[in-house]
Amino acid sequence: MLESLLVPTAIVALAEIGDKTQLLALILAARFRKPWPIIAGIIAATLANHAAAGAVGAWVSSFFTESVLHWILAASFTATALWTLVPDKMDDNETSNARRFGPFVTTLIAFFLAEIGDKTQVATVMLAAQYPHLIMVIIGTTLGMLIANVPVVLAGNFAAEKLPLTLIRRLAATAFIVLAIVAVYSAMKTSGWIG
């Protein structure tokens, strides 16, 4: 039973290193500067996503080819990069949307959506099929996400206090553009457009 917890924890923690959700954690920490609601949102989103991974993962992948998923990912990264560059009032003070949704709900939704089709979701599906203790697998994959993302949230909160938000926004937009380029390359490769 312990193996059903420890192996998924290690696999997901390693898979998360350098993943887009770490960048998302950094952006949310810099934007909201409230690490604990963000961490709580990551926990809730990961539990919900990974609990549904076994059932939903196979269903969604049956509707889209790998190539289509790469194109969707490239478009979402490009849109996120552009959105990141646009200053909003939340940078200076909370708007009604920020008060209405806040860091917890924003993180919950963003992380849940970012994990759909992600390698950690796929890993969760495979691990749940391999190990008999589903609850331990879900707890393990959630712990792996926390091991990888909590330090980023805390560092992002610290960096936001020391660095101008404009610089953080530009760096994040650049990173999302790079991710979009990689996703376009993957889409072209899986479509057979390049060798």
Feature annotation, model-predicted:
Residues 13, 17, 47-48, 82, ...:
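Hydrophobic/aromatic residues within the transmembrane alpha-helices of Major Facilitator Superfamily
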Residues 132, 139-193:
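Hydrophobic secondary-structure block in the mid-to-C-terminal portion of proteins
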Residues 3, 33-97, 102, 154-164, ...:
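Membrane helix-loop-helix hairpins that form the core translocation module of multi-pass transporters
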Residues 55-66, 119-127, 162, 187-195:
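Membrane-interface helix termini and inter-helical loops of multi-pass transporters
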Residues 22-23, 69, 121, 168:
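Short functional linear motifs
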Residues 2-64, 123-144, 151:
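Juxtamembrane transmembrane-helix termini in multi-pass membrane transport proteins
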Residues 86-92, 119-123, 135-138:
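Short, structured loop/turn "capping" segments at alpha-beta junctions
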Residues 1-17, 36, 92-114, 135-139, ...:
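Small-residue-enriched transmembrane helix starts and helix-helix packing motifs
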